[in-house]
């Protein structure tokens, strides 16, 4: 095998993509033509090794079996996909307390079958009014270790309750009391701790033990709950009951708001009653792209996920991936080169669109993808340092959760939400049972300095009052013939984008059913560090070829936990990622 030589041709990515003339005629002339072919989508029980769940009327896929059952019950009772999504959102706050939440925030992409419109709902946490750019720096201008993570200054104004209530009022058919009722019962009567949750509690015990209410809920006899224990959350049940009775006002203006603010005042936090009262979920126009005839509908900023998902797909569309073969060296090579280019742009342009100008049109344009594609050659690889100078972004963890829902009427919902780290700040607002996020760490505490996940940010993501921090969450709906065809998403920090990408490519390019599409090994490249990360299961021969071409290939832990549903003429096919044994897909 001939060893590929690295190219040292420097191509600036700092393009003038704010203007309509992002591509010059000369460059456009060299654009690689788009490949429009796609694999035939099939499901054959006699041929497929992995088999999806099938249902005729509706389907729910989440990371926790009890939450999945809650969502399915809502569908069976006559609720639509949004009713079920809101019910699942509250249920996960009980049964997946490390990531599911009402003290955090996230994003939702909804397809409303009545209006035939897609909407992106932003309920990301927001910086308090008293937040300042330098609030995490000492007098010498250095970042104070842990201040943006495990103190009351780490907590952003929560958005989940506002987001869920907004969605239910706008697109749902049931009352808040109806959809929250199962969660109240789960919190009040308790549920059995799984091995996965028990391990997470053990890992995070030191942070939880610092706070009296957190320890009271998640510990017994000075040790965290373990597998088989019954976890009862009476205070959380009372808070959920207040929200069910009074709506979002209970959380943002009433008794719960007062308790959260009292918690802040006792410990030097910044959130005030004014902050709570002012919070609003925001409807945004989704990012839309096209890939081999399918329409990609995904989340816009302050998520970076949607833009760069479409950007990478635009680049890959120019290559016959089906001919390359799934997870072949040639396919992985093209994934890696496209991923590098997109992640370099991620570091430069993304932030809260209400505060910074983002060149969305340019970043997701086919022409821009064409120019980027011309830098990918068949006989050389470009080192990341030659794409754009910068500092590395080490990998983020899976401390987020995603769920997908489709119903018999053609509605579809994709939700990704989080507390940031496992159990967020570890702080429970006294008397509420509500874990509070540490999402303020997702801002750039100091441009050029990494956050908890090692992500380097710039001025576009600097701390500012009432600003929402940048995210990688990528809830996505794929449309075929103007109808929802695939709902997908995943946790995984910076790896969310590439995980969702591969779930889409595996179904469209390789014709995999949903179970196959999410069970095969994944790869990831995020520009810096300059390495291809792989899961176990990639062929040693493939690894050798990539290494001979000049790539650094690094086996790592599993990436993402996809929850995926596909709509076909005969019903729904779905699957929950086996990387989380607690996940479950159900339908009826």
Predicted regions and their residues:
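Short beta-strand scaffold segments in enzyme catalytic cores
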Residues: 105-112, 401-405, 475-477, 561-567
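Active-site rim segments in enzyme catalytic domains, especially the processed small/beta chain
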Residues: 94-120, 270-272, 412-480, 510, ...
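Bacterial N-terminal signal peptides that target proteins for export
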Residues: 2-12
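Alpha-helical support elements that line or immediately flank enzyme active sites
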Residues: 74-75, 162-170, 246-253, 258, ...
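Extended C-terminal subregions enriched in glycine
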Residues: 467, 509-557
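Noncatalytic scaffold domains of N-terminal-nucleophile
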Residues: 30-69, 81-82, 86-247, 251-253, ...
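Bacterial N-terminal signal peptides
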Residues: 12-22
């Amino acid at each position: 095998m001939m060893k590929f030589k690295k190219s040292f041709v420097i191509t600036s990515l700092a393009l003038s993509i704010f203007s309509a003339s992002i591509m010059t005629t000369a460059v456009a002339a060299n654009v690689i033509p788009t490949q429009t072919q796609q694999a035939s989508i099939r499901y054959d029980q006699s041929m497929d090794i992995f088999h999806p769940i099938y249902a005729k009327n509706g389907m729910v896929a989440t990371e926790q079996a009890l939450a999945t059952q809650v969502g399915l019950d809502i569908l069976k009772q006559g609720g639509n996909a949004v009713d079920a999504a809101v019910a699942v959102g509250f249920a996960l706050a009980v049964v997946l307390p490390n990531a599911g939440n009402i003290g955090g925030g996230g994003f939702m992409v909804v397809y409303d079958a009545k209006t035939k419109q897609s909407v992106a709902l932003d309920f990301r946490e927001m910086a308090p009014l008293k937040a300042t750019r330098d609030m995490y720096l000492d007098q010498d201008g250095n970042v104070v270790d842990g201040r943006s993570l495990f103190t009351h200054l780490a907590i952003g104004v929560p958005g989940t309750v506002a987001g869920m209530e907004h969605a239910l009022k706008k697109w749902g058919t049931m009352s808040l009391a109806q959809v929250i009722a199962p969660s109240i019962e789960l919190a009040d009567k308790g549920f059995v701790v799984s091995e996965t949750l028990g391990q997470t509690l053990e890992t995070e015990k030191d942070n939880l033990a610092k706070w009296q209410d957190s320890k009271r809920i998640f510990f017994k006899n000075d040790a965290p709950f373990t597998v088989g224990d019954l976890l009862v959350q009476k205070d959380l049940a009372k808070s959920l009951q207040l929200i069910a009775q009074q709506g979002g006002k209970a959380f943002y203006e009433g008794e719960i708001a007062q308790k959260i603010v009292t918690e802040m005042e006792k410990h030097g936090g910044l959130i005030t009653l004014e902050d709570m009262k002012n919070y609003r979920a925001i409807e945004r126009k989704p990012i839309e792209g096209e890939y081999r005839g399918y329409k990609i509908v995904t989340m816009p900023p302050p998520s970076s996920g949607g833009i760069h998902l479409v950007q990478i797909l635009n680049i890959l569309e120019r290559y016959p991936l089906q001919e390359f073969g799934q997870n072949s060296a040639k396919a992985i090579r093209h994934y890696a080169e496209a991923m590098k280019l997109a992640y370099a742009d991620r570091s430069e342009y993304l932030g809260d669109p209400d505060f910074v100008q983002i060149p969305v049109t340019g970043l997701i344009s086919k022409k821009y993808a064409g120019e980027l594609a011309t830098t990918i050659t068949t006989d050389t690889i470009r080192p990341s340092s030659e794409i754009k100078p910068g500092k590395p972004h080490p990998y983020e963890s899976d401390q987020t959760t995603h769920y997908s829902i489709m119903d018999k009427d053609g509605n579809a919902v994709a939700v990704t939400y989080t507390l940031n780290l496992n159990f967020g700040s570890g702080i429970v607002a006294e008397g509420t049972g509500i874990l509070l996020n540490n999402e303020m760490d997702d801002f750039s505490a100091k441009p050029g300095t990494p956050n908890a996940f090692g992500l380097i940010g710039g001025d576009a993501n600097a701390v500012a009052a009432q600003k929402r921090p940048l995210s990688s969450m990528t809830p996505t709906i794929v449309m075929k013939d103007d109808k929802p065809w695939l709902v997908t998403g995943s946790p995984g920090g910076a790896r969310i984008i590439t995980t969702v990408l591969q779930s889409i490519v595996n179904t469209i390019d390789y014709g995999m059913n949903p179970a196959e599409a999410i069970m095969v090994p994944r790869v990831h490249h995020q520009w810096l560090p300059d390495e291809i990360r792989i899961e176990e299961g990639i062929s040693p021969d493939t690894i050798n070829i990539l290494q001979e071409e000049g790539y650094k290939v690094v086996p790592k832990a599993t990436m993402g936990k996809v929850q995926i549903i596909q709509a076909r003429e005969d019903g729904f096919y779905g699957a929950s990622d086996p990387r989380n044994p607690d996940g479950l897909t159900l339908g009826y």
